[in-house]
Amino acid sequence: MSRSTKKAPFVHEGLFKKIEEMNGNGEKKVVKTWSRSSTIFPQFIGHTIAVHDGRKHVPVYVSEDMVGHKLGEFVLTRTYKGHDDKTSKR
């Protein structure tokens, strides 16, 4: 289910302000955030955002294809180690 058309896309205010400030200064620093639910805006293109996965911050380089998606979509929170083979138990 998508977000209502009456509502604007969500982005954390602090994150947006940091990106806008860096765009004004021409800087490219890594920005740490815990806001996995923030929508990626076109202003974020070219920046690296460190998104929290529950135990560490994972750097995500934002490209044009990511605009409109959420930051949390690009960072996995669970590790899958696979199932054991039945032959290994014997």
From Swiss-Prot:
One of its GO terms (biological process) is ribosomal small subunit assembly. InterPro entries: Ribosomal_uS19, Ribosomal_uS19_bac-type, Ribosomal_uS19_CS, Ribosomal_uS19_SF. It comes from the Bacteria. SUPFAM superfamilies: Ribosomal protein S19. GO terms for cellular component: cytoplasm; small ribosomal subunit. Coiled coil: none annotated. One of its GO terms (molecular function) is structural constituent of ribosome. Keywords: Ribonucleoprotein, Ribosomal protein, RNA-binding, rRNA-binding. Belongs to the universal ribosomal protein uS19 family. HAMAP family: Ribosomal_uS19. Protein S19 forms a complex with S13 that binds strongly to the 16S ribosomal RNA. This is Small ribosomal subunit protein uS19. It comes from Clostridium beijerinckii (strain ATCC 51743 / NCIMB 8052) (Clostridium acetobutylicum).
